[in-house]
Amino acid sequence: MMASNVSRDVSQDQSSVVQTCKPWYAFATVAAGRFVRFASRVTKHGGSALPGKVVEKIDPGFLTRTLGQLPLGVVLVSGTNGKTTTTRMVASMLSDLGLKVFTNPTGSNFVRGVVSALLTEVTLGGKLDADIAVLELDEAYAVHFVKQVKPRYALLLNVMRDQLDRFGEIDTTAKLLSHVAAATTGTVVLNREDPRIAALAAKAPAGTTVRYFGLADDLRRYFPSDDDMATTVSVEGVAGPFPSARTPLSPLRGQLPSEREAAAGTAELPADVTLTAVGDHKATFQM
């Protein structure tokens, strides 16, 4: 697949930032960030977030400007569980298809972590040599990320009750992810098996495509949702639009041990990437 076959438009806001940045300023930002990273490693203070924090202070437009260079934009992966594995799978598949992929390493799934990861990849002039970024973002930090960078693709996995100390009820987590869906410009890919995630289709803006991933019918009974466990369900009233139909999906059989593999295999990719190519790759991916 040739990356040139895919539209390379960049948003007006991001383009204007790239055009107005002086070369010396980009150099100063990268140099300062790398110095802080070196110093934090030598002193064993600050971790992966400190360089990103410093760069955010001295050059608030660095993230938008740098990711705005990508001809194929940003794929944002978020949800309660499975983010790291899914991000690795999508990045690996795109790389095998011939694209240069930038991705953030495990543990840096917050905005400053992405900035810190960029510092290791850009040239001193601020050039990022990549076609597309596949980024894992924590649910809470994803909200702040999309205020600076609108993803072209979003892959939203699930909301689960394993972080009650952070977010409270899972409806709060779903609300956080709704901001990601609302900011996505190209395609939002949602988990059909998670009702709260599937409902985010209503948040996608006009012109943004919505796609779903899910389990084969013979596997769905092994992964019940909270709603499936209820003995009685009643609806007393609906305040807004309510879906009247479900789009039929073609199940992927025999290769889906869990939802995250399904997500990686059905993510909406550039137009000339086929499911056949993705399916061939899944057989060789090493967990």
Regions inferred by a protein language model and the residue ranges of each:
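Short, basic phosphate-binding NTP loop
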Residues: 2-9, 13, 17-78, 93-97, ...
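Conserved glycine(s) of the Walker
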Residues: 82
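A conserved segment at the C-terminal end of the G1
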Residues: 85-102
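Short beta-strand-centered segment that lines the nucleotide-binding/catalytic pocket of NTP-utilizing
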Residues: 99-112
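Short, well-ordered alpha-helical microsegments
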Residues: 111, 141-143, 197-198
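Conserved nucleotide-sensing/catalytic segment adjacent to the nucleotide-binding pocket
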Residues: 115, 120-148
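Proline-aspartate-enriched helix->loop->beta-strand connector
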Residues: 151-152
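Acidic, Mg2+-coordinating active-site environments of NTP-dependent enzymes
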Residues: 156-287
